[in-house]
Amino acid sequence: EWGILMYEGLLAVLALGTVALFREDVKRAFPFHRPTIAKTVGTVLMWIGTLLITMIPTSILLYVFPEQMSGATESVSELSGGLPFGIAFLLICVTPAIFEEMAFRGGLFSCFRGFRSPWLAILISAVVFGAFHGSFWRFVPTAMLGIAMGYLLAETDNMFYNMLFHLINNALPTLLLQLTSSVASEQMESAEAMASTGILLVTVAVYFIYASAGPFLLYAGNYLIHKG
């Protein structure tokens, strides 16, 4: 547990070092302002919309490469296994939301703020963010989440919202694991066996249907983060 905390803390130190190296203004690199209700709701809607859209590459990869995808999703379960919920929430949800956002949407993002289009900073930070998680199979959906968080920062100039997005995204699997921790081991083994053998094509189609709601939620969220 301490190793994870120190590792995440090192990211924050590197972010601060990067800002100092490039002589960036700390307040500009890590902008924080009082959040508004509209922007907060918009952030939640954008997270839901992004999550639904990431179902498309995730379901395709799960259908084509079931064993690899099953292995890629075990890290959170292994990390939180046996830990009290409070500690698991701190390690998996809170510290990454703060320290990883400082590193990728803070230090790294600020290096490219001088360019005319913010999309260079958004895309580069998202690609590095996806690669940072060390799994080829998780790269695309993770990078897509990184794009959404970078966009939030670029449009709101407030790290509160991309940190909130990151926190919610990590909290969902953590909460689900806690809720299912009481399931009998036989049932868990059966579920893992089903995951390792893949999903039906009809399930992929269902995911695509869910994902179709994503653009509407992104539009609504985008409206609110600009309205608020």
Describe each model-derived feature in a short phrase.
Residues 6, 45-46, 95, 124-128, ...:
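Hydrophobic residues within alpha-helical transmembrane segments
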Residues 1-2, 27-98, 114, 187, ...:
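Juxtamembrane helix-loop-helix connectors linking adjacent transmembrane helices
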Residues 99-124, 151-158:
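Membrane-interface helix/loop boundary segments of multi-pass membrane proteins
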Residues 1-23:
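Alpha-helical transmembrane segments in multi-pass membrane proteins
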Residues 11-19, 47-55, 201-226:
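Hydrophobic core of alpha-helical transmembrane segments in multi-pass integral membrane proteins
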Residues 126, 138-196:
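Functionally important transmembrane alpha-helices
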Residues 131-137:
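Membrane-interface helix caps and helix-loop-helix hairpins in membrane proteins
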Residues 5, 40-45, 86, 90, ...:
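Hydrophobic alpha-helical transmembrane segments
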